[in-house]
């Protein structure tokens, strides 16, 4: 399968030279190291988020470095993970997105976060792979690809919302030429310090989307 066939419309904003360099490095790493996520999930965020429906870009640090945790979707966990065993970062994100401080009926929260991606959020890390148990180990490998990706997206799609989670993601702000850029602490920081992520992040995104496009993101289902 060619890159054009695999990435579909995303190929418009992907620097194929940088991508090929990263893929060559990936092939070497996966054959000699333990790497997260599974190779078939590295580009999963692009598969789930339709390019023509892109509204928001979330950028984190790197995938969960523990075995069988990373899914290729920023902050997402597998559907079969018990609620009390969710990753600390996802617990922080869930609490802010649902905002349990306001009244709710019963809710369903998609812990895979695939539903967010399908609604037009590109959910990527600033490094798409990581060596198992070695946080930040592939940061420089992916930086050229992610940098050019963000620049090309912003030039081709004015008016998007970009959320940069943590200091590493924040270093990519100069690549973003248009749109709204929001910088917030990484939820891992909130988990470590036992602080909360501000729910205004999610309500603010929806206010802007409603104002610009007349739509909002359904962060959870309520019934």
Where does each model-flagged region fall?
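A polyanion-binding, active-site-adjacent surface
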Residues: 6-164, 168-176, 180-183, 189-192, ...
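GGW-centered surface loops in extracellular recognition modules
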Residues: 1-4
């Amino acid at each position: 399968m060619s890159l054009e066939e695999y990435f579909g419309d995303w190929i418009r904003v992907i620097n194929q030279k940088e991508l090929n360099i990263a893929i060559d490095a990936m092939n070497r790493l996966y054959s000699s190291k333990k790497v997260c996520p599974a190779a078939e999930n590295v580009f999963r965020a692009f598969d789930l988020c339709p390019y023509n429906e892109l509204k928001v870009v979330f950028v984190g640090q790197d995938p969960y470095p523990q075995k069988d945790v990373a899914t290729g979707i920023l902050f997402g966990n597998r559907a079969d993970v018990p609620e009390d065993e969710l990753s600390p970062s996802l617990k922080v994100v869930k609490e802010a997105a649902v905002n349990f401080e306001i009244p709710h009926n019963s809710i369903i929260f998609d812990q895979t976060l695939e539903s967010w991606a399908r609604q037009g959020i590109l959910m990527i890390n600033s490094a798409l792979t990581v060596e198992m148990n070695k946080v930040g180990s592939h940061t420089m490998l992916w930086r050229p690809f992610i940098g050019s990706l963000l620049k090309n997206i912003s030039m081709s799609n004015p008016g998007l919302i970009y959320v940069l989670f943590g200091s590493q993601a924040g270093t990519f702000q100069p690549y973003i030429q248009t749109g709204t850029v929001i910088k917030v602490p990484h939820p891992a920081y909130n988990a470590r310090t036992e602080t909360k992520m501000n729910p205004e992040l999610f309500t603010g995104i929806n206010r802007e989307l409603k104002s610009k496009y007349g739509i909002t993101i359904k962060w959870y289902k309520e019934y």
